[in-house]
């Protein structure tokens, strides 16, 4: 989390791979801009639902719809009301509900956008169909 400069220096030197995902993105707007300017996807975990994560929600708002993902980061970082318990994939729905509120869109629209991004990124998994 404190290695932004080093991470971006390495990616710049080696070339940012197509479809790079910043897993469990926890930076603020400045870090989001640096990643988005390099064509990366940002993936938000339950942290975005925490009361003290205003900067992270501001960073999420910078993310274009076609480069936005949500994730669990199981078994850690469960969103409220599950905070303090083991995180699980089912809780991604809560993270997506908060994401929809942040973006001012319906849960269905937010879920459709993030699902489409997942399908584009991970086409082999998408070919298996919904789980």
Positions of PLM-derived features:
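Catalytic pocket-lining loop regions of alpha/beta-barrel enzymes
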Residues: 1-70, 126-131
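Divalent metal-coordination and catalytic microenvironments
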Residues: 23, 35, 73, 110, ...
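Conserved short-loop catalytic and cofactor-binding motifs
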Residues: 44-47, 80-83, 98
């Amino acid at each position: 989390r404190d290695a932004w400069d080093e991470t971006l220096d390495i990616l710049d030197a080696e070339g940012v791979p197509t479809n790079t995902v910043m897993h469990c993105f926890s930076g603020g707007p400045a870090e989001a801009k640096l990643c988005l300017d390099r064509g990366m996807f940002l993936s938000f975990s339950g942290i975005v639902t925490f009361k003290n994560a205003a900067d992270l929600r501001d960073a999420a708002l910078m993310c274009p719809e076609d480069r936005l993902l949500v994730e669990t980061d199981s078994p850690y970082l469960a969103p409220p009301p599950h905070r303090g318990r083991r995180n699980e994939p089912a809780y991604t729905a809560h993270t997506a509900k908060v994401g929809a509120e942040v973006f001012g869109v319906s849960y269905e629209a937010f879920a459709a956008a993030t699902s489409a991004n997942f399908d584009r990124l991970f086409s082999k998994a998408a070919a298996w169909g919904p789980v």
